[in-house]
Amino acid sequence: MKTLIIAEKPSVGRDIARVLGCKQKGDGFLHSDEYIISWAIGHLVSLKEPDDYDPALKKWKMHDLPIIPTEMGLRALPKTTKQLNLLKKMLTSKEVSQIICATDSGREGELIFRYIYQWANCKKPVKRLWISSLTDAAITDGLAKMKDGREYDNLFASARCRAEADWLVGMNATRAYTIKCGELLPMGRVQTPTLAIIVNRHHEIAAFVPEKYWEVKATFVTENGEAYTGMYFASAHDTHTGQMETVGDAALGVPLVNDDMTGNGTPRAASPTKTAGIHLADAETRIPSETIAKEIAAKVKDAPGKVESIETEEKRQLPPQLFDLTELQRECNRVLGFSAQKTLTIAQALYETHKMITYPRTDSRYLSGDMAPKLKPILESAPAPYDALAASLLAMPTLPTGSRIINDAKVTDHHAIIPTGSKKPLSALSADEKAVYDRIMRNFLAVFHPAYVYDVTTIITIAVEERFRSRGKTDRKLGWKAVYSHEKNQKNDKAEKDSEDVVLPPLIQNQPVTATDTEVLHKKTQPPKPYTEATLLSAMEHAGRFVEDEALKEALKQSGLGTPATRANMIEKLISSEYIKRNKKSLIPTEKGIRLIGIVPPEMRQPETTGKWERGLSRIAAGELDDTKFMDSIRRYVTYLVGEAGKV
């Protein structure tokens, strides 16, 4: 008797076969005296189409909606029927006594296997291989730790409910609104609220009315001829308070809610640097009147002044955390200009083909405790140009692995993306593959480095009772930034953006200076920026920010809109459906996309719906919710959607 192992893809099947010594080749499988190893090619089985239930449903008619089958059936995908029939033959073979499910370790991988198993009407016992890397060591370890397949029944129930709910909502909503509007309008649980996020930003930009403001910059020169610049700011000592009741966005008719106030307009607790009792917020440099700005500039020009105060504050910036897929996609979009889909495709190749990184479709940024002994060997195998950085870490008495790196409570189906320690030469990679591998390797190296430490020096200069602020930044310890020192634009430069970064000469308090020049800067408030793929991925991941209900906010905090593995495809689907288009790095809604969001009911375009679903699916996976109750609620929702479409 033999054990049948079913992988998700041929390449994974061949990796497992290599470890188990299965060298005999068949048509669509490998085998030995003990094992038969075959594979799916992604999904081989899908849910039936409406016309599979009733041929009359091939034509889209409003009176046929909603389409809610009593029991959802399966159909073979035509392009892969040959492989499906082979697997069915193997699953039902008397030669096979046990099955090992070796599809991807996650909800979708579980669904792929279970649909094939169900299609073949197989009842044989199943073991589950659950791994996060395709190295020989990881596969061997996984085979030794397999669990009974029944332990994943709840995961399958969650996956099946997700697939059936997506089918019911997508199929019925798409047909209903397409029929009513006379143009093809694909819709979906994740697709439509994602489109709404982009459309809402478009409306915010269109409705934005820029407000003018002015700033005054002065050049100060010491008695030794050393020059530096400073920006005028309003303060408690300001002589113009009678004319400028407030300075900043609020004075310009725009509530200052992003940085210095809470969402309800209440001022936040003071956090800016204080000097001589003065709060130094960026908004205080804004002057709402050109006349006042010119008066200040004229008054200060050529006037004597002095350095009123000097304050140096040490700041620290922690290293980045390890990548999950979404963060890797954001990074590659920001640094390399890659689309989310391109990054996913390359990461998948680095995982499957080259075996150089761990499973990429993860939503965790942490490692499990059992990974700790494997970290030094990975560093020891780091190729040039990373070997010198790795050597400095290996020289430490112990590798720092705090809770920001190793945290069992925050590891989901798979741990964060890290290198595997493969000895494969970088020359085997394409240029794009090298670029993505570089981001992953440097991220892995950076997390073990200490914080980046720097000083921010704030100087207040006073001239004829007007105050000017100058800031400069000085590196003290590069820490993790040394990993990125070769890059012109440093990674994650929030620290730099927090300062004005002028070059400051050596100065002492009360040192006399002269304002040799002043300049009035004409500026205006800026609208929100269109989404890029990087910022849209963030919005999808943190969709709970758009939700008020705390329970739903928490559900979306855990899952967001879509999954790391599906978000890239969702962006591409919105583009192919002609709902959005790329404009350089920006994602812009089309008229068609704007039109759709204008007619669908709020429940279809708001993330709350997905929050409810994801909370339900998570409870099903945890064994806390009956899947029948979940599907009953979906059927009621579909009936409501069709009714709302009829009102358009």
Q: Where do the protein language model's features map onto the residues?
A:
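Intrinsically disordered, low-complexity regulatory segments
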Residues: 1-163, 167, 284, 527
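Conserved short loop/turn motifs at secondary-structure junctions
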Residues: 1-2, 102-105, 182-186, 312-321, ...
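Basic, low-complexity terminal or inter-domain segments flanking catalytic cores
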Residues: 2-4, 26, 80, 91, ...
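C-terminal or mid-to-C-terminal helical accessory/interaction module adjacent to the motor/catalytic core
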Residues: 72-79, 85, 94, 134-220, ...
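C-terminal helical "lid" subdomain and adjoining coupling/linker elements of P-loop NTPases
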Residues: 180-186, 198-247, 261, 274-289, ...
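Metal- or metallocofactor-binding catalytic centers and their adjacent structured scaffolds
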Residues: 276-321
